From Swiss-Prot:
Core subunit of the mitochondrial membrane respiratory chain NADH dehydrogenase (Complex I) that is believed to belong to the minimal assembly required for catalysis. Complex I functions in the transfer of electrons from NADH to the respiratory chain. The immediate electron acceptor for the enzyme is believed to be ubiquinone. Core subunit of respiratory chain NADH dehydrogenase (Complex I) which is composed of 45 different subunits. Interacts with TMEM242. It comes from the Eukaryota. The keyword Cell inner membrane does not apply. Keywords: Electron transport, Membrane, Mitochondrion, Mitochondrion inner membrane, NAD, Respiratory chain, Translocase, Transmembrane, Transmembrane helix, Transport, Ubiquinone. This is NADH-ubiquinone oxidoreductase chain 2. Belongs to the complex I subunit 2 family. The gene is MT-ND2. The chain crosses the membrane at residues 1-21, 25-45, 60-80, 96-116, 127-147, 149-169, 178-198, 202-222, 239-259, 274-294, 326-346. It catalyses: a ubiquinone + NADH + 5 H(+)(in) = a ubiquinol + NAD(+) + 4 H(+)(out). One of its GO terms (molecular function) is NADH dehydrogenase (ubiquinone) activity. InterPro entries: Complex_I_Subunit_2, NADH_DH_su2_C, NADH_UbQ_OxRdtase_chain2, ND/Mrp_TM. It comes from Suncus etruscus. Its EC number is 7.1.1.2.
């Protein structure tokens, strides 16, 4: 792809997300989603292959369906309220349709099936955009309309997402699919707290983007997409392998790493709101995620003895300079837990 065209597409993606975040008019919000979707599809197909074409087609069909449901919700709301203001969503049917459209765009259960397939079919750079930046626009709209969202529906979807994000990753060895199921589980945690404390949901989003970006940067730097190839990086870059495994454990929420912070704060906030069963179930289901992350870390670091015979490796490692943001991102992704009291105070 021409670098100039790629820059224009990235600018359009950011512009579409910015329109959704700053708009108070329903039509402009829908327009921002459409701009974002049409610009990200060529980015997904940047490295042309049948697999990337299939992934882009699945993404287009899912997002187009969600946009259609979103427009239907907007029209129904307009019929009953006569206003285009975003915060005015009093109709039950419109609220349910809007919630369905947004969780479909986010990839929450039971509309999660496209996330692992699309992520596995695209390059690491495209997967980074798909699992980080593309979550901002739907979550920003949910943040604006959270008082009118059906609480029970959102909590059921969040629990399903945490459960499926854990179960789905148990038998995976492909890192992109592991990151996709991790995304589904993290979205479930964000939705669970959205009703009670939307600011905490935004903090969770920030930490999730931080950890996911760190992991993808490490994978891009090491040119690896599977656990086997990641474990073989011991021969070339042992520091990269160690940092990758640390970020994986942080994504699983293992204390004392950064990933434990949002889970700690969310469980504390739910308990303050006299909710005991929900955080208990969420904590139990989160053990599924932690289990497969620890199993992957164990198999990669302790059971595969490093070999010095580099001729056995199908190595695509490129001697490029470490990205300038990589080390600060990794540090924040693993060692930011002591900042938790500060975030609790600000919250």
């Amino acid at each position: 792809m021409n670098p100039m065209i790629f820059i224009i597409l990235l600018g359009t993606i950011m512009l579409g997300t910015s329109i959704v975040m700053t708009s108070s008019h329903w039509f402009l919000t829908w327009l921002g989603f459409e701009m974002n979707m049409m610009a990200v599809i060529p980015v997904l197909m940047k490295k042309y292959s049948p697999r990337s074409m299939e992934a882009a087609t699945k993404y287009f069909l899912t997002q187009a369906t969600a946009s259609m449901i979103l427009m239907l919700a907007i029209i129904i709301n307009l019929m009953f309220s006569g206003q285009w203001t975003i915060t005015n969503m009093d109709n039950f049917t419109a609220s349910m349709l809007l919630t369905t459209a947004l969780v479909m765009k986010l990839g929450l259960a039971p509309f999660h099936f496209w996330v692992p397939e699309v992520t596995q079919g695209v390059s690491l750079n495209s997967g980074l955009i798909l699992l980080t930046w593309q979550k901002i626009a739907p979550l920003s709209l949910l943040y604006q309309i959270y008082p009118s969202i059906n609480t029970n529906l959102l909590l059921i979807m969040s629990l399903l997402s945490i459960m499926i994000g854990g179960w789905g990753g148990l038998n995976q060895t492909q890192l992109r699919k592991i990151m996709a199921y991790s995304s589904i589980a993290h979205m479930g945690w964000m939705m669970a707290i959205m009703i009670y404390n939307p600011n905490l949901s935004l903090l969770n989003l920030f930490i999730y983007i931080l950890m996911t970006s760190s992991m993808f940067m490490l994978l891009i730097f090491a040119s690896t997409t599977s656990m086997l190839s990641l474990s073989l990086t011991w021969n070339k870059t042992p520091i990269i392998t160690i940092m990758s495994l640390m970020v994986l454990l942080s994504l699983g929420g293992l204390p004392p790493l950064t990933g434990f912070m949002p889970k700690w704060m969310i469980i504390q906030e739910l308990t303050k709101n006299n909710s005991v069963i929900l955080p208990t179930l969420m904590a139990i289901l989160a053990l599924l995620n932690l289990f497969f992350y620890m199993r992957l870390t164990y198999s990669s670091a302790l059971t595969m003895f490093p070999t010095m015979n580099n001729t056995k490796l199908t190595w695509q490692y490129q001697n490029t300079n470490i990205l300038p943001m990589m080390m600060p991102l990794i540090t924040m992704s693993t060692l930011a837990l002591p900042l938790t009291p500060l975030f609790i105070l600000l919250n």
